[in-house]
């Protein structure tokens, strides 16, 4: 009996040492990579701390152009849906425990879609004088959308020579043509989603203004399975001309993206589910962002997933149908930009559906805004130090790749998932001085309660977080009122531990 107890104790000690070494080695490596790169190099000094003695010759020209763009953007009645609140009444269905909600299988719903298609007839008269995809009708079972032939301008888009391949992925290929970007889609589901989303947006009054920061299609062709968009120079991920001098511009850009997400969720009842730096396309003039749009709707889903989407296409006379797929928490957002609360559920219950966490438009909206906060976190690191940001991003992606490659049944996947959360908590703590005392402690408490076997290691990490100093260079951002608002946005979105809770105002009122 004594030998069994000693063996069990020895096994427990070995297990503790294993987890302790795992956490401490990774944390030490990440901390060293950051601390060794907190001093500004010459390139960073030029980017982030402009010298008044050597101003750029085009400075006045750039400032004039930026002010002109800003004045033009602000003269319209822009949306300011930046206060996301949720009713917490006991009668709300969102109050139920997400782990106890029945998850309707996508197979059963696909069978229902097939049955619905047999019942729906095409109203050919509705195509007359139709110029854009338009909702025809909506029932408890389906939403009917008509797509006209005129809208799919093959002569201008599909038949144009493809000048250059911009990129290729699992969803299709993107080419640059004379009229913009044409994307060849491999699957029907994405082109159906694009048609439905456009029909949903244009039914909102004043959609041209509200959707100014959403990348919507210029043309959809069901015959060639292509979608055409306006061309943008780059995306936020590859943007590397960050400057503290442009903080007002960056804060204004993220404010516009917040309005776009609120419009998409609160007015169009659509969740993006893939907000990331690579999906935010921008036009720039040196360090200034002139225009930014949120694109890539391959994971975009309607809040009410029970209705089938049926497309009547004038091009080939066929009726196409699609139903919402079951988006699990692990299949939404890129892991680097996944909200911390969502990452916690990935570690504890990876098969959970997002519809079990969010039931109302405001809850889906908070989830998308939290992902945008993660984008702002890595973006702001570039303002502090280019080398620091590169080190942090390299460390994050290496850990995240290990997490994604691990098999579901492997215990290391949970360990890497915890490490992802800890890294994110540490970065936000070093970026926002008051974050840990306000919100970070509650996340650490949840981790300790969920994984009591790691309690000693997590307590050690908790102590480190409590004593951690801000990144060198944060003070420069804090001294700027626009930088302070940007850090507040990061802190608020990172501290969300339940999408049902009110997020509150995420930016102060925009003043021109």
From Swiss-Prot:
Positions of the catalytic residues: 274
The entry's keywords: Kinase, Transferase
One Pfam family in the UniProt entry: UL97
Catalytic activity: L-tyrosyl-[protein] + ATP = O-phospho-L-tyrosyl-[protein] + ADP + H(+)
GO MF entry, a single one: protein tyrosine kinase activity
Annotated family: Belongs to the protein kinase superfamily. Tyr protein kinase family.
Name of the featured protein: Phosphotransferase UL97 homolog
